[in-house]
Amino acid sequence: MAYIPNAERYTQMEYRRCGRSGLKLPLLSMGLWHNFGDTNSLEHMAQLCETAFDGGITHFDLANNYGPPAGAAERNFGKLLKTIFAGHRDELVISTKAGYDMWEGPYGEWGSRKYLLASLDQSLQRLGLDSVSYTHLTLPTIA
């Protein structure tokens, strides 16, 4: 059976503007870390996302290293975007971030421009998207 979102979803959540961007975000966002790794079923992930969206949560937050394994959360959420959220992409705010070790070699870590651009390209590929609403860099404390 196809997912039909709650028609009252936007009356149940308060939304606020994000700085001067004009972007409205719900007071609650859904982070897709451990619950969206390969250790959980896609059905469980779909149920979590449907419940969140039915309650007015429109912002889904990911990162290049969310899983396990790293990258799995983006890949799994990408599957949900093609199925349950296929007709609702314009209603979603999708963010991702980078900043942790992801691949071998001198460019798979930390915060260089090269790393951030490569990481974003890989995230978009895993998500099956041309763009995300925003991305940011999370840097571990450098001693």
List PLM regions with ranges:
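Conserved small/polar residues in nucleotide/adenosyl-binding loops
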Residues: 135-141
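Structural motif corresponding to the early beta-alpha repeats
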Residues: 84-111
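Active-site mouth loops of central-metabolism enzymes
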Residues: 33-42, 104-114
